[in-house]
């Protein structure tokens, strides 16, 4: 809570009173944004009538200050990945998973019962680890319902990453991406141990920093 309060104080100090209100509103919407099955950032979830022209600068401030991490949608799993980015579609993650947990007001005891948030918390944790390793954050969705949590570039190759909060790891979305773009190797982060099967590298969540 103290860290959150210091962030809010910094918003007022460096962004000015008027802008800091919108910045705080955008930041406070993150738990709602991430808890949704479709967790693409939606301005309307900040408040009724909110739109990019009103809050775009506030989002940029949060990103530039390092308070949030931006993950941009890529429309194709092809190189160069940056050429296929849809800059209007993105997700925002907390730069600190502890802050996300604090904003959800979850305790160690209640965390196990809040299963609807486990996927979001897992994604947020992985986003932080990938960013710390210097990767640009992207994700992919098909025109249907398929979605790959993260898409990165390793040694000039597109590598999709799937995050699972448990040991159940089957993913039609990952399979669809691999077949569509002839991907040589994928990464799956889950509660399972290290392994390699069907060109999928299995990495336990605790070792996400190894990616």
Positions of PLM-derived features:
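Accessory nucleic acid-recognition modules appended to NTPase machines
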Residues: 1-155
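Short hydrophobic-aromatic micro-motifs
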Residues: 92-95, 161, 202
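Short catalytic-loop micro-motif centered on adjacent basic/acidic residues
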Residues: 138-139, 160-163
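C-terminal helix of von Willebrand factor
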Residues: 205-211
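Catalytic cores of nucleic-acid endonucleases
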Residues: 165-205
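Structural motif
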Residues: 157-159, 185
């Amino acid at each position: 809570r103290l860290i959150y309060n210091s962030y809010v104080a910094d918003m007022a100090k460096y962004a000015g009173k008027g802008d800091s209100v919108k910045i705080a509103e955008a930041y406070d919407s993150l738990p709602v944004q991430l808890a949704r099955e479709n967790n693409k950032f939606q301005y309307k979830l900040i408040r009724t009538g909110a739109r990019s022209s009103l809050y775009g600068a506030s989002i940029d401030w949060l990103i530039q200050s390092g308070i949030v991490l931006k993950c941009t949608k890529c429309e194709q799993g092809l190189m160069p990945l940056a050429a296929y980015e849809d800059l209007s579609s993105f997700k925002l993650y907390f730069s600190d998973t502890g802050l996300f947990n604090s904003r959800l007001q979850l305790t160690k005891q209640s965390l196990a019962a809040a299963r609807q948030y486990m996927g979001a918390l897992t994604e947020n944790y992985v986003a932080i680890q990938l960013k710390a390793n210097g990767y640009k954050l992207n994700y992919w969705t098909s025109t249907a319902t398929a979605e790959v949590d993260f898409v990165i570039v390793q040694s000039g190759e597109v590598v999709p990453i799937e995050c699972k909060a448990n040991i159940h790891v089957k993913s039609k979305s990952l399979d669809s991406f691999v077949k569509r773009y002839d991907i040589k190797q994928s990464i799956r982060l889950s509660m399972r141990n290290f392994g390699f099967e069907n060109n999928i590298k299995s990495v336990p969540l605790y070792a996400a920093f190894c990616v």
